[in-house]
Amino acid sequence: MKIKSDYSNEPQWKEVTVKSTLPKELACLDELAHNMWWAWNYEARNMFKALDEELYEEVGHNPVQLLERLSYDRKEAIVKDKKLMKQVSDVYKKFRAYMDVKPNAKRASVAYFCMEFGLNQALKIYSGGLGILAGDYLKEASDSNVNFCAVGFLYRFGYFTQSLSMDGQQIAKYDSQNFNSLPIERELDENGNQVVVDVPYRNYMVHALVWRVNVGRIKLYLLDTDNDMNSEYDRPITHSLYGGDWENRLKQEILLGIGGMLTLKKLGIKKDIYHCNEGHAALCNLQRLCDYIDGGLTFNQAMELVRASSLYTVHTPVPAGHDYFDEELFGKYMGDYPAKLGISWDEFIGMGRTNPDDHSERFCMSTFACNTCQEINGVSKLHGWVSQKMFAPLWKGYFPEENAVGYVTNGVHLPTWTATEWRKVYDKYFDKSFMSDQSNESIWHAIYNVPDAEIWETRMALKQKLIKYIRDKFTKQWLRNQGDPAKVVSILERINPNALMIGFCRRFATYKRAHLLFTDLERLEKIVNNPERPVLFFFSGKAHPADGAGQGLIKRIFEISRMPQFLGKIIFLEDYDMQLARRLVSGVDIWMNTPTRPLEASGTSGEKAEMNGVVNLSVLDGWWVEGYREGAGWALPEKRTYQNQGYQDQLDAATIYGLLENDITPLYFNKDAKKGYSEDWVKVVKNSIATIAPHYTMKRQLDDYYDKFYESQAKRSHKLEANDNKLAKEIALWKESVAERWDSIYVVSKDEDALQDIATGHKIKVTYTIDEQGLNDAVGLELVFLKNAPVDDVNIHKVIPFKMVKTEGNHYTFEATFDATVAGAYKYAVRMYPKNDLLPHRQDFAYVKWIG
């Protein structure tokens, strides 16, 4: 027998974790490292940095990894260093004092669902604005000490890291995260085993491990499908943020909504309010419906309870930005749910359609959210109005401005985004109640007491800090990826701290109009190369790997930045993350934003700049519509001049050039020869901090959600649940009765002839008698007047409610009086609607019949 040259079976690898141990004197460091409180407390970050500054930079400011890699000798040296040990002790005492305060039990409790959370660059479970906002929200919930928890995903690869090739092509790289080296912990059951949640996907289960992030006092639960219990088709569900095809996207949204609710249920967590931050999480309400129905309620009764305690926040300004799923794909995973709900398939999928009977229409998560959440809000005042129009087809009997779509303008977490240098200024000059009373503009007005020289010195220190950061971070990377060492060195050397520095940093979607500045290169060249008034532009941001147009913009900016006349004057900084963002929003002089109106739902990067004395130059869109104050920044008009976008771009570009040439640079460089700074510029900075910043903190945003939505919804929800859900059952029964008889309600008689020709100053009485078919005063009537205008420009002139004046059996007589005060041409009609004081608003039961 011939002997084989090799013979081996496959090894059965088993995981083993070797943990770095800390001396008992440093045991508190592990607790500190595993609570993201350090992410917004500079004393804690400085303490970790002091343990080993070089290693701290090497591990990307990740305290968990820092402690893992500290050498035995270094740990021993730390214990012997009295000054450093005192620093450790002081930080831990501050942390414990913060953590040991009991939650505010008087405020409504909230469960918050989101696809991404931006807490710190060390935990890559975010991509952009939505995630950063959600992360800031959790931090403020912790600071405000409310009863709050959140659900999201632990992504194996997170969002991509970005580099640029020698010709400016974006290179996306997905780096695997080592979960054991992250500031997270396994959520354990009573037996010490990691909690696993079994999530039903039609005909099989997906098994998600549950991890926990301690965000100060708040718990964020993260689901992870990348484990051996799942097939090769389901492990990737939590691989990448917004990764894969539409089938994987649906699987992600099932996991977030249904899996998220099952997680809370398994952990014994019940909250007053369930907040869907974007439509991705809408299926949490499907699971809640199932739970109530399993408890003995009908579908309609369950819907009353689910809607009352649910809030949907939309961040998308256009219908195309929402998620839509083909019926076949949706049925592949969701086909079992109609039976669980006790309704038909058409009724179920119709909950995600604007027109439920249109079988060609795809299922939309945002529509499902609107149909299962009592309250809906946009993320700025303008976006609230945009959302009213966007969702208007869901409530066809009402005009957009009548819809119960509210708004809460986004804010930013002050401790996270305010540079240490500014924190020290605020601590020195502002009232001691500042952090707990951030929306109090009178406190911020103390900025006027800060000497001008101190304001200027703070700004210059942060500009120098940004320049140092760029030189430290990008020198090696640019030499490695972008060739031509002489050109790289020239760029870095030409960064002039005395130049007016302008930042344009955000996601590179085409509607952000990053190209606008480059409309007239000759004019731009004169602006940046003015020897008396030099200007420098920093660009940064990622384009989605599937967005060729966005990547093309990056490539174009890179190419321009390498032209001799723009070398060191136009600079693109790759891999925009939270760390780079913090340096930029505090280090530049002006934050520029040029979105296509009205496609900026809110935008928050400009708000972060405000906290650091950085002045905004922006189109009046998103938050800046509300935030702009004359003498505290610059604005491009809100109204479009041209419908042709190309013409509008040219006009906006010319406006920006003009502002830079005639207003901004003369102001900045009007420096006093003796003082060395521009008093006029410092005045703008002070105005900006005093009059704008107080209104855009995350503290104000959280308080707005409580004041506008959480508290009132919780109060109503508790009423519906009381006495074995008595009120919920009554409302469901009433709606069923109205729905059953609605089509048979008819007009018995009417008198509206006097409305044909009216002279101003006259009062006209209109009378209708309605047969309510035994509904017992369940109908309301109103006279709706519109201004005569094109069909696509409908404006309500007046809505006049009818009063019920007489009843005879099922016949109800209503009267309304029209007071003709303003001459003009109008259209009118009479609208009939179900009337019940127990409803939160009309769109909760949007039956409408136009009669007459």
Report residues per predicted region.
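Catalytic cores of carbohydrate-active enzymes across secretory and cytosolic contexts
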Residues: M1-G852
